[in-house]
Amino acid sequence: AKYNLPVYITQGTLNGCRFNIREDLIRLLYSTQNISVGSLEITSFLKIHDASEPHSFVVSNGGTKVGVFTDIGAACEQLIFHFKQCHAAFLETNYDDDLLSKSAYPYFLKQRISGGRGHLSNKHALDLFINHRPSFMTHLLLSHLSKDNNNPELAHSLFSEHAGEVEIVVASRFVESEVYTIFEQVSEHSPF
């Protein structure tokens, strides 16, 4: 409420919310709903995660699309559909399988993280990237890396081997990412 900004939230997430949001700031969000904020259009869609009515988002401006895909248990059809349309994406690479298995985390937490409704591993995120990245993708920001169960250099190296022309960036948990110029590439067959 400090900035009096509207909060776009699903009913399920609102019901499970642990803090108070002023009623006049609440904007209920529904699956596959498009919301306009200035010149941006935001599309939301349901995803697999162990939360109440979780959604991911694609932010568009003109023909350029940026996906925000974090807190994902598995790459469902909805996620794949939207990922294939993105010029850039923030993609969860939460954990490395070996680091998680050797970590001090209790068994139940390891199962929650890796059990298909928790978080996306480096391997699963890489599979999504290799098999479904569009030819026009320019940037991939590896996001939501666990400080205990992943390593930024490891994740970057893994993706860089398969990146081609895509710039791979590890999003820091401590500082903002740089500003990138991302644009819709026009094919040589386009009349424009």
Tell where the protein language model's regions lie, with residue ranges.
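Short, surface-exposed connector motifs at secondary-structure boundaries
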Residues: 1-3, 62-63, 135-141
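Binuclear metal-dependent phosphoesterase catalytic core
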Residues: 158, 165-192
